Design a protein with these regions (language model features):
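Short amphipathic alpha-helical surface micro-motifs
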Residues: 1-3, 54
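Short, Lys/Arg-enriched anionic-surface-contact patches
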Residues: 3-25, 73
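Long, charge-rich, low-complexity alpha-helical segments
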Residues: 25-77
């Protein structure tokens, strides 16, 4: 999945946050919904997205996870 084909960031739209191209749907909103257990189909219906948009959001997050290390505090669940 080449997420660059479906995701863009424009300072004039949603404060420059990553969004699905041609929309104001932020990638973080898609990921928040999926992380909360919302089925991909429900996210697609709720935000008028295509499956490829949701897949691009996940691929974008995967790339970020490979690039960014978030320190974990021992003993904190």
């Amino acid at each position: 999945m080449n997420w660059q084909e479906r995701i863009t960031a424009d300072p004039a739209i949603c404060h420059g946050r990553a969004c699905i191209k041609g929309t104001r749907v932020m990638v973080s909103v898609i990921l928040d919904n999926l992380a909360a257990g919302e089925p991909a189909e429900a996210v697609m219906r709720g935000y008028h997205l295509q499956r490829e948009d949701v897949e691009a959001a996940v691929a974008y997050a995967a790339d970020l996870a490979r690039e960014t290390v978030i320190p974990f505090i021992p003993g904190v669940a």
